Amino acid sequence: MATKLIGGEIYDPAHQIDGKKQDLYIVDGKITHKLPDNEKITATHDLSGCIVMAGAIDLHTHIGGGKVNIARTMMLEDEHAHPHPSTQICRSGNGHVVPSTFSTGYRYAEMGYTACFEPAVLPVNARQAHMEMADTPMVDKGGYVLLGNDDFLLSMMQKKVSQSAINDYVAWILDASQCIGIKVVNAGGVHAFKYNQRRLDVDESGPAGITPRDIINKLSRAVHELGVSHPLHVHASNLGIPGNFKSTLATMAAAEGLPIHLTHIQFHSYGTEGDYKFSSAACEIAEAINCTPNVTADVGQIMFGQTITTSGDTMMQYFGHEHAHPKKWTVMDIECEMGCGVIPFKYRDKSFVNALQWAIGLEIFLQVN
């Protein structure tokens, strides 16, 4: 049983197809350009005048879990100012900075996305995160579960348990949370913040006597040995701090050649040059990515205007709360598993720092192969 798609204008960079009109077939849920001999066409759709291309994937977007609802509660004025009435085919919703679930799905579909992944699922809150994502229409969803600051893993590492034991724990967490990957946020730093520590670099021991390098190494190895499709998803140390590109390079090295994905790397690509002691280190980061085949990254490009930042990195969220706009914020500990910080923020194109952040993201886009 197959479905035929006729007359569409196909764009497929992976196969060097640029605007070619060609028929396609859907067989057993997969798209193919040839119909198998034993298949019969059961439906035909005319796509004349339409563009046919692969759906976009957002591998890091906050669309489910407690922090998103905290953000909605914090920005009620935004919810009220942006109502989205129902139509014949769409349900009602609201919000611009933090849209409701229905509006989130519709906006993603309008932009051509077909899959979105929530990168900060707390094990204790996984059920609620999945329920919220299930309420988001029109796109496939998945999540990465947070480890690397939880007391259980750190206690295992203190006791110097075997790698296989850590692998078992990671596998159990993945199964219990029903997530498709592992995320580490400021490895060991969120745990250190609970002890009133304000910074933790990659080779600095935290209160548990464990370094971020140790945590990243153990978790990246566990994810690799378990055969998880997505590599360890890493929010590196010292987000937003001038000079943090050195921490980012050290984080890449911590994986020791195993696959690792560095997220919103723009926020981890800062130097200390110039009058303001804040500069771009995009060249150094891009060169390192190009020369390190086990490392992938997403940019985390900023957009000017009002937004709200949601993160498990309580250390860095507390550091930035003085810049909240409007002036309200929250950080909290979650069951000794992880942290949560929610801060509204307005990126301004006339701000030196914000304009440079935008330019750094563009540099990375252009320089990474």
Which residue stretches match the model-derived regions?
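Hydrophobic faces of well-ordered beta-strands that scaffold small-molecule active sites
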Residues: 55-59, 116-118, 141-145, 180-184, ...
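Short, surface-exposed connector motifs at secondary-structure boundaries
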Residues: 108-115, 225-233, 259-260, 367-369
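Active-site mouth loops of central-metabolism enzymes
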Residues: 82-100, 147-167, 207-209
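Active-site neighborhoods of metal-dependent hydrolases
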Residues: 165-222, 238-249, 255-369
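N-terminal metal-binding scaffold of metallo-dependent hydrolase/deaminase domains
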Residues: 1-53
